[in-house]
Amino acid sequence: MQLNEVCLRANRKLSVLRSVKILNRQTLDLLYKITLRSVIDYALPVYFNNLTQKQKMRLEQIQYRAAKLVTGALHLTSKDKLNTELGWETIKKRSEILGLNIFHKIHRYETRPLIRSCMPKIDYERENNLRSKGAYIPFKNYGSKFNSSFFPYHTKLWNTLPKNIKALNITDFKTFTNTMKPTRYKHFQKGNKYANSLLTRIRVGRSQLNQQTFSLGQIDSPECLCHHKEESPMHYFLDCFLYLQERQAMLQLFEHYIPNFNLLYI
């Protein structure tokens, strides 16, 4: 089966990624996209929507394990928070984006004629209606499996797009579909792997800070060693007297790069 082969190949690539996990985050992110995600992407829009929920989760789980390797995140980290942290779309969203790009390419007659013959007919009456966003007549209902196959599913999805988007060339259309992806914060990749991993764990809410560890039921109290009621990120960075020297060194470094930063801090 296609899915089993994809998962087998992806897990092999994941093993390679695991062997070089000490590399910096930017490099690991790039390696994931070049080696592992390219395996998942192959024919993904064609078969993804006909998978069962359990089968879809197998693909999502592979990406989740890769995200933990890239960021150095701990076990039980939220999958959604990791995707937001990295600026990665879910496998489902990626399937839709890739499918729309392929469908638009076929619509623009930039593929072989044979595949164009699989397209539905253009709804000229609705196309001339200024209020209508539709361009193709939807396929007849032949059951959920047929409706989830490539052409019926992406015809329906493509018909929901605004007319000005449908008129774009393929390059501009891909620029549009890229806006459907989560925002990517490049400064999250800065620093060496260890320091970057520590900051990432705090951002995604799964660090060794007592507040975050307590929320998972791994310790009995969120109290800080200084006896503050919660060892939260805010308390850790700005208030706890146990880290006064480290905080002063951090603020001096900020002041060096950002003049008058101390005024903002106060």
Residue ranges and their predicted role:
Residues 113-153, 184-188, 203, 216-219:
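Amphipathic alpha-helical
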Residues 22-34, 89-95, 141-145, 187-195, ...:
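Structural motif
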Residues 178-266:
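Family-specific functional microsites
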Residues 80, 85-89, 94-97, 101, ...:
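Amphipathic alpha-helical/coiled-coil segments positioned at domain termini
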Residues 55-127, 235:
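Short, charged alpha-helical motifs in flexible N/C-terminal segments and linkers
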Residues 35-50, 96-101, 105-106, 157:
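Extended, well-ordered alpha-helical segments in internal regulatory regions
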Residues 1-46:
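Basic, alpha-helical interaction scaffolds
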